A protein has these predicted regions:
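Extended, charge-rich alpha-helical scaffolding segments
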Residues: 2-93
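Short terminal interaction segments
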Residues: 84-172
């Protein structure tokens, strides 16, 4: 039984490290997105988002596995946990010093990369918001510079003409 639980702890540590590596890839994609946002390259942003979505699907699968491992460990070791779900700290508190140190380090490194990802996502969100505001202002200015003049010709038909017309591609 003890060997089986050590195996679960080792598997959990490896899982955390795999998640950390995937989040590092996500961080790199977010950095590329920053450049694409600045260059206003929608196609690149879309391609990066598709890649990122695949990685997030992997993370979701790993998270399910991690929760399952933690619950299995908790059940076999009668781990007391605070709240409804078992935390990594709950497991760290019950394992030997070497395993505790390894799990704690894996958890800390995962948390560091998660914070980096969150920070760069916040920056990218602000960049996108700023770009949208810029385009809203630009479009408003262009709309205001377009006018419609109309009158009637000798034949009684209305003649309408737009001066300074602005054409928009609604699919863009």
């Amino acid at each position: 039984m003890e060997g089986q639980m050590q195996h679960v702890v080792l598997k959990l540590k490896n899982l955390l490290n795999i998640e950390k590596d995937i989040y590092f890839e996500i961080f790199n994609i977010e950095e590329e997105k920053s450049e694409a946002i600045i260059k206003k390259s929608g196609k690149v942003i879309e391609e990066l988002s598709v890649s990122q979505e695949r990685l997030l699907n992997k993370i979701e699968s790993l998270e399910k596995e991690r929760i399952k491992l933690m619950e299995e460990y908790s059940k076999h070791r009668n781990v007391l946990h605070h709240g409804n779900e078992i935390t990594l700290q709950d497991i760290i508190d019950t394992v030997d010093a070497k395993s505790s140190s390894a799990l704690k380090l894996a958890g800390i490194e995962l948390k560091k990369i998660l914070l980096k990802v969150k920070n760069i996502q916040d920056v990218n969100s602000q960049l996108l918001k700023d770009n949208m505001e810029f385009y809203d202002i630009l479009i408003s200015g262009l709309k205001n510079s377009s006018t419609l003049r109309s009158g009637y010709g000798r034949d009684g038909k209305e003649k309408g003409r737009v001066f300074n017309p602005v054409l928009f591609n609604i699919k863009a």
